[in-house]
């Protein structure tokens, strides 16, 4: 069986070793359930081994899950100076000689040894009608899984403030936008929600 079919069909050995790799400083072990049933491309795979039963035994992914970076909101971009919210507070950051081609809005941050090594925007988004039980629902009824660690930003008095997902589930806002790292069929999840 082909590795892509094995993952899509959930044929993963019980003792499979799966690692998602971003770079030499950023990588993590992945549980089989995180990728089982998703659609891989060969460009998502750095290395793999199948066992004699045709099950996936070893897999090194090429930054496939999207779980290796942090997600937040860029609130200001001026040259190599940035303001962003990852946790509860807005933080200023200067990248020195390195300039990232980004704009204000939803973003990912690659962080190694406590230092930001890359910033990029997340452009894939969906307008959400409701949020319930860790799922965002679009106007057409399509469901989008929301990451357990999704960041929620609600505009209060003209500024975005960090909230928790349960705050959206208690009160659905008239405008809610979910930003996802990639199509859900490929393991993508909503990582950031903005609301007002």
Stretch-by-stretch model annotation:
Residues 1-196:
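...the same signal can extend to comparable exposed beta-sheet modules
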């Amino acid at each position: 069986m082909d590795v892509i079919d094995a993952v899509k069909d959930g044929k993963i050995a019980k003792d499979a070793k799966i690692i998602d790799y971003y770079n030499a400083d950023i990588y993590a072990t992945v549980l089989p359930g995180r990728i089982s049933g998703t659609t891989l491309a060969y460009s998502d795979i750095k290395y793999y081994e199948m066992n004699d039963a045709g099950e996936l035994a070893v897999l090194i992914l090429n930054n496939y899950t999207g779980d290796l970076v942090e997600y937040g909101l860029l609130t200001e971009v001026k040259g190599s100076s940035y303001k962003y919210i990852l946790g509860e507070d807005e933080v200023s950051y200067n990248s020195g000689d390195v300039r990232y081609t980004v704009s204000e809005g939803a973003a990912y941050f690659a962080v190694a040894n406590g230092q930001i090594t890359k910033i990029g925007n997340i452009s894939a988004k969906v307008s959400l009608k409701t949020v319930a039980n860790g799922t965002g629902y679009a106007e057409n009824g399509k469901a989008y899984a929301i990451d357990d660690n999704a960041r929620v930003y609600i505009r209060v008095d003209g500024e975005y403030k960090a909230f928790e997902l349960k705050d959206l589930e208690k009160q659905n806002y008239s405008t809610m936008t979910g930003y996802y790292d990639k199509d859900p069929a490929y393991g993508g999840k909503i990582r950031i929600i903005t609301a007002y």
